[in-house]
Amino acid sequence: MIAMKIAECEDKGMTFGEVIDTVETYIEDQHTYFLLESLEALRKNGRLTGLKAMVATALSIKPVMGATPEGTICQLGQARGMKKALVKMADEIAAHEEHAEDKILAISHCNCPARAEELKKLLLARLQPKDVIILDTAGISSLYASDGGVIAVI
């Protein structure tokens, strides 16, 4: 998405300094949200104790997570079951986003395109972004999201 923003700036004929300022503002205004099928990655990296992960998994509790401006991960909400968690995620995104009509929504998924499409549908009922892109996770995102994980950036 950052590369797309740089290309957009170039198409507008911006100077190098203007591109830098515009892209830095764009990055500061981006928000990341995610929902994991498995809590194993959170347990392994110490963000969730083994006992909490076991109980949450047994009860099918899915935490809706987000990134803070400082780059740390925080829990925004939770729900029992993936369908309810997707609704909760869409609600959280809609509650925190201003001027969505000026932004591109990117939804990345790890082997769950139907889940990404469902999140898109839920979000389009709440927001009207400039565009929506759905893509597969890649690299380190795939490792953390694991199968069934969904990441939204707007």
Roles of regions detected by a PLM:
Residues 1-154:
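Mixed-charge interfacial surface used for oligomerization/domain docking
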